[in-house]
């Protein structure tokens, strides 16, 4: 897995290309505050990886094992720690910078964005699982109900994993193949085309696309 970074979704806007006459909706992601927490190697840990920490946090809000781990490697208390693993033979980036940011990406690059979707609360099966519902004809009183949920006398219970009403949303989702429209290192923000999972202020992970290579590798 190539190196990625953690960011905060600030919201959406649009970018207009004067030459092409195209308006592109983009999501603005703030990537300031990333810090290398630990570099793992095959000799010391059995595999190559790097841990990236994000978001300053009060010490009393971080549990002691995590706080001790971060302090051991020279990082302060952080909200999120994410590990990016590198395969054997994969090129590893330079970790001397200490604070990775928007410069890891470039205009025109394809990325995958991982986030947590918006919560919808307690919902029925029509909204939660896209059930078609019951007939809407005259006299019917169960328009949006799921219908039968059990088999009968045997097994005398509802099967596990039966699709039923419940809490909907707050799922971990990955949106693949989003194009980096603009990289602004001076502001430490990245503008990616389209929407990314989650609400404003939600945390996301940005990493190079698995299905589409970076511009240099594509040539």
Model region roles, listed by residue range:
Residues 1-219:
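Extended basic (Lys/Arg/His-rich) segments that typically form rRNA-contacting surfaces
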């Amino acid at each position: 897995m190539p190196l990625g970074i953690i960011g905060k979704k600030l919201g959406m806007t649009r970018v207009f290309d004067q030459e092409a006459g195209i308006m592109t909706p983009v999501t603005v992601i703030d990537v300031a505050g990333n810090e290398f927490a630990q570099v793992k190697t095959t000799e010391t840990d059995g595999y190559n990886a790097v841990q990236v920490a994000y978001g300053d946090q009060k010490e009393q809000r971080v549990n002691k094992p995590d706080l001790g781990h971060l302090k051991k490697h020279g990082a302060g208390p952080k909200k999120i720690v994410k590990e990016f693993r590198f395969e054997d033979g994969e090129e590893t980036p330079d970790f001397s910078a200490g604070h990775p940011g928007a410069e890891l990406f470039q205009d025109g690059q394809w990325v995958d964005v991982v986030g947590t979707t918006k919560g919808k609360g307690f919902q029925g099966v029509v909204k939660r699982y896209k059930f078609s519902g019951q007939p809407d004809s005259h006299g019917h009183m169960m328009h949006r109900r799921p219908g039968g949920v059990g088999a009968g006398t045997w097994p005398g219970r509802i099967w596990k994993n039966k699709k039923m009403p419940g809490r909907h949303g707050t799922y971990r989702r990955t949106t693949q193949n989003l194009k980096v429209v603009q990289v602004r290192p001076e502001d430490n923000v990245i503008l990616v085309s389209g929407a990314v999972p989650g609400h404003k202020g939600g945390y996301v992970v940005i990493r190079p696309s698995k299905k589409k290579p970076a511009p240099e590798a594509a040539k």
